[in-house]
Amino acid sequence: MPSSSDAINRISYISLVTSDNDKFNQTFQFYSQLGFRLTKSFSKVSSYGSGLGANHPEFQLGVSHDSLKEVWLESYPLQNVDSNGNLRPWQEMEVYDGDNCERLNESTVIKVRLLGETPLKSISQKQFVFFTTQLNKIEKILTDANVKYGKVVDNVILAEDPLNNIISFSNTQNELCKTRFQSPEEYVEKTTAEILAKRKKSQLGSKFGSFEEISPSEVGGGNGLRKKKIGVMTSGGDAPGMNPAVRAVVRAGIYYGCDVYAVYEGYEGLVKGGDLLKKMEWSDVRSYMSLGGTSIGTARCKEFRERAGRLQGAYNMIKNGIDALVVCGGDGSLTGADLFRSEWPSLVKELVDTGKLTKEEVSPYEHLTIVGLVGSIDNDMSGTDVTIGAFSALERITEMVDYIGATAASHSRAFVVEVMGRHCGWLALLSGLATGADFVFIPERPPKAGLWKEQLKEVCLRHREYGRRKTTVIVAEGAIDDELNPITSEEVKQVLADLGLDTRNTILGHVQRGGTAVAFDRRLATLQGVEAVKAVLEMTPDTPSPMIGILKHKIVRIPLVDAVKQTKAVAEAISNKDFDKAMSLRDNSFYDDYRYFRDISIYDDGSKQLSEDKRLNIAIVHVGAASAGLNAATRAVALYSLSRGHKLYAVQDGFAGLVKGDLKNLTWMDVEGWHSLGGSEIGTNRSLPSQNIGKVAYNLQKFNIQGLLIVGGFEAFTSLHELSEQKANYPIFEIPMVVVPATVSNNVPGTEYSLGADTCLNQLVSYCDAVQQSASSTRRRVFVVEVQGGHSGYVASYCGLITGALATYTPESNINLRELQGDIDLLQKVFATDRGEDHNGTLIVRNEQASAVYSTQLIADILKENANKRFETRTAIPGHVQQGFTPSANDRVMAVKFSLKAMEFIETRNGCYGKHDRKFSDEEISEHSQVVIGIHGDVVKFTCIKHLYDNEANVALRKGKTVHWTDMIDVANILNGKSLLKKQERY
């Protein structure tokens, strides 16, 4: 007899080999009698001598290449039977909870093979151990087959198969199990009960729907510390981006080991309590990213303004164990939250004194933590460059004015558009820049009382004389003159009507709040929501309540009281007629935006023209792939040039056109309406100066070009480097040249932002939302979405964050099998308990150059192969749709800023400014004439092309060396569950 170490227990698969045809048939017959069922039969040579199996490859799947014959025998798992004795389907059994759930027991497959030559003989005899619940039936089968057998103990039968393998049968599952089963029914009943009990225990302590099974909350709670409970609420007017903020707070809170409660209906939910305070699970916020408004509701609550209301709010928070509050709202909501915190100790004391709560109940809640998120479409909060929802509202306004512009041009009408903003003119000013408005009225820079009507008439009439068929005037709802008299849209309408214009008045109203958040707001809200949770966990009772803001493109914490105080100071400055102070209290770029609007819309009357000797000939050329913002930048440069007296030449069809000498002098009407046009009206391609550098120099000299703007992506960057390197041979290349980055890939060294990237991301938001809706509607579907970006992972990382993708593959991350396996594990957990009711559709985002091996289709196939039928996969490739049709509002505004800043650089290098009028310091312009304009934080700066090319450019991969979007990758991994899965593996 073999030793116990030679025994093979709990067999799932075994291959038995012989070269004797009789023994092959005997072995097949032996195991068939024991209850194994034939599932596959293969023979290379049939009984008639024809090679049936050999001629049909589909019959050979899984068959060993050296087998003449094979039979596959399988013992199926034990299952329940119905009243007629028929097996019930596995999916109808009580223990079934998805195809990957634990089974009652595993099946066994025996492959019997016939070889043409004698196989190697085994050194030792092997023993196979089979589990059975019917030993008496096994004895009868062996007896009827005249097979000798014996018993070692009363519950183990030993026998030999025709190939002399020792097989044993036992009615215990393994050596550690003491239970001896006497019937299939007994085993099924007991095992079913054990599986259900184990599952119930697992679901009580951990359930992936809430991500508690991989949450590190046990780590924080296991050391005797009370688990932090955070409330999140939205208050005041709704704003796009509030839902992504709530999603971020909920999931980041769970990730950091906290319980998170949604306070429904704003402060009203805090006062009323009950069902309006709901503990949130991971899956509760699954679809929040693509929803506009706020799904947890908002309301203006009069009760909370009174101490009695705040007292009741404190009571409800303590009863639910909540001692931290993240409030997303405007300045009024955040002021109320900070007042609540300052009163908290006295409110707690009053609750004890009145007997509503005991000292023991309130002792863990002596201090309240408040963190503010600014959700406001007005962008009127000081201390932050932009508020959640502002860019979404700007996008809505821009879209509506574009629509209005179409009908206005058709009928040659004038439209007065009133936008929201209260005491803040940000929406009015930037929408004026983005839509090419003739005039804007904002409270921070009011016109002269008694004179503004004539000024308005003069500007609008002049533009009509230039050939414009429509007139657009944007009025902020808080617009005033310098004597604080309100300027209403009706008044403005009457002024235009007096000019004889067919005028209409449009108040956009709450349409500005509507719709889903744009890409920028989704990112802003998500990053700020995660930062809010970190602030809650890091604050002490002495820490002032912070407001989470964004300064220089970095998420920061600002004392809430200071921000509110400074915000109110703007209104006070306006009421005191100190308009310069009001302008200075706005974000850093507000004054520049106002200055640029005047340059291209008001000062085209010739009042700011330079003297004849300082007027320049400037050329602009588009290089590389089309990108949103090219035309908007060209329009801004053309209008600025006309207002300053310069000549602007548009190079047709890139550097190929410059080689031909195909340049056109642009007029005012040539660029009319270009602010809203995508693509390139003057033509663009990937041709470089090096194709005929001599001709490029000749035509620049021929047209006496004194400054060159190169608008485009990495080809524009390369073009400037080629021109700069040839300065010694062609002195004309000493003229100031500026690259204005414009590419969806955002891969130009020297800048963190390129024109067209925002439009691309907004396109991807719409595309991925639609794809995700399809995935959710069809249930259990995973889409692998391929996005552009070249070898830069910026677009993919941004897209993955703002669409809630489960995984993002970029060139920087290096896809490998280990990472794919981790994502497969995460997907399997996501779908493990899903029965189709959760609308559980999932996205994976892949950059087009993420891997030369793991293509989009291959990743989808690998996921599908490992899905075990729990989900299916599809691919989605938006392709050139990502370039967009109409530029986003943000791209239009940035096109004006970039291009006019570049023009000021060219003017400065050509000595157009006097000593006191210069726009740049000596350090900024230095000795370099060939530069790239870029954004670093919120600072626009110029960097020498030689420095960038030599030190910061990866020329081979056509991108910069700096990865400035790592924060998006880290936050995305927290919110998609990947970081949680890794923590589970560690703990």
Swiss-Prot record:
Region (N-terminal catalytic PFK domain 1): 1-602
Recorded metabolic or biological pathway in which this protein acts: Carbohydrate degradation; glycolysis; D-glyceraldehyde 3-phosphate and glycerone phosphate from D-glucose: step 3/4
Positions annotated to bind beta-D-fructose 2,6-bisphosphate 2: 781, 874
E.C. no: 2.7.1.11
Subcellular location: Cytoplasm
Residues involved in beta-D-fructose 6-phosphate 2 binding: 413, 504
Cofactor: Mg(2+)
GO biological-process terms attached to the record: canonical glycolysis; fructose 1,6-bisphosphate metabolic process; fructose 6-phosphate metabolic process; regulation of intracellular pH
Record keywords, A-Z: Allosteric enzyme, ATP-binding, Cytoplasm, Glycolysis, Kinase, Magnesium, Metal-binding, Nucleotide-binding, Transferase
Domain of life: Eukaryota
Activity control: Allosterically activated by ADP, AMP, or fructose 2,6-bisphosphate, and allosterically inhibited by ATP or citrate.
One Pfam short name: Pfk_N
PROSITE patterns on file: PHOSPHOFRUCTOKINASE
Chain spans, region C-terminal regulatory PFK domain 2: 617-987
Binding site for Mg(2+): 331
GO terms for MF: 6-phosphofructokinase activity; AMP binding; ATP binding; fructose-6-phosphate binding; identical protein binding; metal ion binding; monosaccharide binding; proton-transporting ATPase activity, rotational mechanism
Residues where ATP binds: 237, 300-301, 330-333
Catalytic reaction annotation: beta-D-fructose 6-phosphate + ATP = beta-D-fructose 1,6-bisphosphate + ADP + H(+)
Similarity remark: Belongs to the phosphofructokinase type A (PFKA) family. ATP-dependent PFK group I subfamily. Eukaryotic two domain clade 'E' sub-subfamily.
Function of the molecule: Catalyzes the phosphorylation of D-fructose 6-phosphate to fructose 1,6-bisphosphate by ATP, the first committing step of glycolysis.
HAMAP family reported for this sequence: Phosphofructokinase_I_E
Complex and partners: Heterooctamer of 4 alpha and 4 beta chains.
Protein known as: ATP-dependent 6-phosphofructokinase subunit alpha
Organism the protein comes from: Candida albicans
Gene encoding the protein: PFK1
